[in-house]
Amino acid sequence: MGGVALATGLGSSPAAADPRRGLTTYVLVHGTHSAGAFWMPIARELTLRGHRVVMVDQPRHGAEAFVPESYQRQDLKAMAAELSPLKGLGLEDYEARVTGIVRRAARNGPVVLVGHSLGGVSVSRVGDAVPHLLHHICYMAAFCPSRVLPTADACTAAPENANAVSPVELTVGDPDRLGVLRLNFRTGDSRELALLKEMICADYPDAEFRRVLAGLQTDEPVAAYAGRAVGRAGSWGRLPRTYLRFGRDRTIATALQDRMIAEADAFTPGNSFRVHDFPGASHIGPMDPIPVAEILDTLAA
């Protein structure tokens, strides 16, 4: 979500002399309008438990982020027209970024691939492309497309997502012309801020909500939502997989999470999701990273 933020533990010692060889590496993929740094609290916990962690920045996210000049000035008229270098990026680019990191990490031991939100489509694509390099895959309140709902767009439009809060009314500019869904996270409008908080982290204090907003970026390519991300039974479908289900999610509604889990399990009846329920969690998960990290820790080889 090539810029890659590495947590700790990726050393250069010869493999034969490196006691870390064989440790599990967690490759963490961020969601829409986000960056690898989103994962820092969870990555810190996993590192302290003895794992290696790589927090992926997808192309033009995080360390490569594009910040519109008009966004800095809060000139909304100019912001509606300013061109974006993210236009034209798609799931092929996201898949390539994550696959490259997985290939490197797998040289040193087992890899657990985890995606949040839109990061789920990358998990599905990479899991389908290189299942032999993955020990486990995990979706954290993430899109898991199916043959019936093959894209993030299709998942979002499903009736089970009717309870979700849509950012459409907050969109700046024409997504078809700009090639990106552009949102203004620096808005001072109280109604817009209330909508964003409900969508992202309704259970967080306002101060924490503002911190979350500060880490988000304006642009996400529309092609990423529209790209097909359906795993095949013989590749993606044979990987052990886990779903972290968030019960107060207003971005990917809990009912939609349940449908995606059910459709995946029906597609691979001999290999079902291991589901862990967080009934009070909103879209970005609990404020305390420890409960999530504890579950991820159990996925290690």
Regions found by a protein language model. Give the residues of each.
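N-terminal export signals
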Residues: 1-17
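Flexible "cap/lid" loop of the alpha/beta hydrolase fold
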Residues: 139-181
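Conserved serine/cysteine hydrolase catalytic core
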Residues: 218-270, 274-281
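Active-site glycine-rich loops that stabilize anionic/oxyanionic intermediates
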Residues: 31-34, 117-118
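Conserved acidic catalytic loop of the alpha/beta-hydrolase fold
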Residues: 93-109
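Conserved hydrolase catalytic core segment
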Residues: 110, 114-151
